[in-house]
Amino acid sequence: MIKYRNSSIHIQSVRGMHDCLPKDVIQWQYIEDVLKTILNGYGYNEIRFPIIECTDLFKRSIGEVTDVVEKEMYTFIDQHGNDLTLRPEGTSGCVRAGIENSLFYHQEPRLWYMGPMFRRERPQKGRYRQFHQFSAEAFGCVGPDIDVELILITNRCWKELGISNYLTLELNSIGLLSSRMIYRKKLISFLEKNKHNLDDSSKRRLYSNPMRILDTKNVKIKELLAHAPVLSDYLDDCSKNHFLNLCRLLDIANVTYIVNPYLVRGLDYYNRTVFEWVTDKLGVKKTICAGGRYDDLIKQLGGGSIPAVGFAIGLERVVLLMKLIKSSIINTRNVYIDVYLIRLGTYYQEYSIKLSEHIREKLPFLRLMVDCGGGNFKQQIDRAEKNNSRFVIVVDDKNFFEQTIILKELQSKKQEILKYDEIILKLRKIYNM
């Protein structure tokens, strides 16, 4: 975004979209690595697909009368007249990729992916217009055991990240479409009688998507809904049994949960199981992770009749929660430079290049930075300290001719002179490599 201030051009990021600076990336990478390791351990494979899809994909999958499609998508027409959209969620694109590349043909893939999503919502704490999700999808399994597996995966993620004590699992079953249509009529009838108590948002949804009113944040409407018909009373027997078995398996796995009869998802493709992991540590109750079954979506988008279930974790909210509880679980080693190489004299270039690459080859996990700014010894030491370096290696003309190295610990100021072939053994001992 370009703004003009006092006749000068001021360039800044688009509202609701933020930069992730190096000091923050360290925490992001840690979280992503934990999630990747867990998903890979459960046998899930990574898939990558475009952030831009045909707009019709989201209209058909999410639903044309949802807030996402009606108000929140970033949609544009390209130079060839194609109607395109920046993905507001990942499941639709993942399913499209699976159909297009025949991933579901005689297979039951289990996939994970992560990346940016885009929605034009009002920016606030934990809600951005470009946000990032880590998601998993499992295809071809119809029983509640796969639902449980995904919940167990998320539960394990929270434990590994040290945030499990701050999250609550909420569950519900929204049944089949036929059950929801019966319930929809009952709910509309109830709300019509109390229309004078509805806010503008609920009135707008009354006939287009009344079940979304169940997810309201308005306290007065929540009190009203306490007297409304309950969806569970209208579920078909198969959906009831599916949900009962889901709860039974979670009990066996010692997973604590709350059945929330008002829990619905904002995307039309969901059926039967829906779940959310929520926290109240970010102010108003915030969803950290959400998921559920979408057994009809693949067929709806032109594939076969293949059941599926998935979840999405909001990475920004995980980061916020971990910062709020001041989690010390992050490995801060990557914040620092292990060794900073200072170069002085005439012959430093040849020797420092040879030395630094030798160290990197033998100790690939060591963080080594070579000073390229020039200047005297003090100036280079200052740069080493600004980069949070633990040790410096000093290379000058004398070292070049003697094939030696000065290794200095910045905090203690202790230093020693080592031979070229001794530096690897010394650093291995220091860093237990």
Curated annotation (Swiss-Prot):
It is an enzyme of class 6 (ligase). One of its GO terms (biological process) is histidyl-tRNA aminoacylation. InterPro entries: aa-tRNA-synth_II (IPR006195), aa-tRNA-synth_II/BPL/LPL (IPR045864), Anticodon-bd (IPR004154), Anticodon-bd_dom_sf (IPR036621), His-tRNA-ligase (IPR015807), HisRS-like_core (IPR041715), HisRS/HisZ (IPR004516). Keywords: Aminoacyl-tRNA synthetase, ATP-binding, Cytoplasm, Ligase, Nucleotide-binding, Protein biosynthesis. Signal peptide: none annotated. Its main location: cytoplasm. Its EC number is 6.1.1.21. It is found in: Cytoplasm. It catalyses: tRNA(His) + L-histidine + ATP = L-histidyl-tRNA(His) + AMP + diphosphate + H(+). It holds the Pfam family HGTP_anticodon. One of its GO terms (molecular function) is ATP binding. GO terms for cellular component: cytoplasm. Belongs to the class-II aminoacyl-tRNA synthetase family. Homodimer. This is Histidine--tRNA ligase. It comes from Blochmanniella floridana.
